Amino acid sequence: MERSDFVDRVIIYVKGGKGGDGSASFRHEKYVPKGGPDGGDGGNGGYVFLRANSNLSTLLTVAEKKKYIAENGENGKGKKMHGRNGKDIIIDVPLGTVVKDFETGEIIADLDKNGMVVCVARGGKGGRGNVHFKSSTMRTPKISERGAEGEERKLILELKLLADVGLVGYPNVGKSSFISKISNAKPKIANYPFTTLIPNLGVVQVDDLQFVVADIPGLIKGASKGVGLGNVFLRHVERCSVIVHIVDISGFEGRDPVNDYFDIRRELEYFSEDLAKKEEIIVANKIDLLSKEELEERIQKLKNATGKETFPTSVLTGKGIREVIYKMAEMVKESKKLNVEGEIVNERVKRPKPIWKELPEKFVIEIKRDGDDFVVAGPYVEEWAKRLNLTQRDGYNKFMELLEKNGLDNKLREAGAKDGDTVWIAGRAFEFKE
């Protein structure tokens, strides 16, 4: 994977499909002169789902599109034929993707199991056909409902890598070399800071235990505040159960391993208290550059300052690496005992009810002034104006009947309307008459 291919945060827009409109058709058959209404219901709009896929390691393909709009439901047809439901969209994302609402920051889902599925935008419910409006007083209803709009929202997708062990430490202390030595990872390695611009993942096998190690780049003093790209990558350490802190014990490039250790520790604490509490060991790398006496003195100083178990190693010669691998395996195994979670594979898609705005219990009419004109408004009025097809004679009549039955004329008088004044209802102008 090239460096530019790694995308771990993206903002996308999702929208469920609109419900299809109900039909206002009538039965037309030979020898059936009064066939009556036979308009079918509209289909429901399609949904948008996110699905965790362990074969993906980046949000790149999601970022390339950014807008995901499900298919609308089909309109109802004659002969009581129901419109087809709109097709769903299923967006595959990497395992470990956290889904947040862009407006509120609320976490909607944490897709931490392979095959896990979450609905992020519901489709609108299809409108009813005229067969639902037939009554003793309306035998040939030329009326149907429009389908509801689908749910829409902006989402933040953040990838938090699902690694068991996180490697932290200043740039150029040997993290990339270490992960390539202990695993199947093949990172690009060079001798300058910020060599690694993406987290490298490697799989380590110890006897019957397999675990994932992540090399977390960009950590320096001030990382939690954005220095050196550190805040971009710190969230990838959050899921790790074990932290391996690598320091350059040689100090040949002017580094002080004790100061370096505490610089990074403070950044972990600033970023997350939970992160700072994770199990940690120290790997003192580059011991091949020191004499025996210098090494013993520096290792003791580091242990005294940190109180942490410390492993002298040389990634170059391989000395001490085996001991670190087995210690990591022991810590991962212990952590897995404490956090036993079953895998969810091919999880059944849970489909909530389609969007259909529930009307308030009480029909409230609001009258607003717009200059000399009067505007009829209110949740009930606005919803019925959307729901009924006002271009249909009976739909329009039913809408006006609802308003009049709930005191429209009295409300207008109370608001000061006089004979001849202009009243706006659902985008149409009427003349008020006493």
Curated annotation (Swiss-Prot):
One of its GO terms (cellular component) is cytoplasm. Monomer. Its EC number is 3.6.5.-. One of its GO terms (biological process) is ribosome biogenesis. Residues 163-333 form the OBG-type G domain. Residues 355-434 form the OCT domain. PROSITE patterns: G_OBG, GTP1_OBG, OBG, OCT. Belongs to the TRAFAC class OBG-HflX-like GTPase superfamily. OBG GTPase family. It comes from Thermosipho melanesiensis (strain DSM 12029 / CIP 104789 / BI429). This is GTPase Obg.
